[in-house]
Amino acid sequence: MKVALLSETSNAKAFLVDDAWCAQEKLNGERMLVEKAGAVVTAHSRQGEPRTLPATVEAVALTSELDFLLDGEWIAGQFVAFDILSINGADVTALPQSARFAAMAEVSPFRLVRQALRKDKSALLASVRAEKGEGLVFKLRDAAYMDGRTEAGVKFKFWKSASFIVTDLDIAKGTVGLGGFGRCSFPFAGVWPKVGEVVEVRYLLLTKNGKLSQPAFLGVRSDLTAADVATQVIA
């Protein structure tokens, strides 16, 4: 099954004041579906490719007495759930988002994404901004889960971010080449991305000469391909 994909908005206020929409913290991890079926726990990327989970994560999943299929993100060594697609083999994607989130809170053994309703949405936005988070995701509370591109959810980001193909590495200077968009620094000790891999980069704006302003390396996007990068609009 394809995961739900969101469009982007620059106007958070309209969604903050509309009670038809809830707000969730926007995470900056790898999109992942995690399924428990009996004693078997599996994970897949947004394209349906299998992913290997640490034994600790499998152990957490197996603490649930119920089977489930969760949509979420792998971030900072843990899985964070933000939607549920099935419970004990029963498809729940036709349920409204509000009902699915409530059911997920009962079923999921994993941490849930922070969600806020009504007036609490503004407080969540302020909290995420103060923590230097990425932004918020707004979802229609009465909408079913739709795979592929959907209008039932939008993302609002404090900074812009996009995915780029690594064209070269300058390890001596600690920078990653992003083709015609310039270079970003590799700010921490770790495993360098490979040439040809897709990486996520945060930036302030795109300059008049097509370069990224204040780019910051966020991580490798193993859930994306070069074809995905080719279809995005960078502005």
Placement of each model-derived feature along the sequence:
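Acidic, low-complexity intrinsically disordered tails
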Residues: 228-235
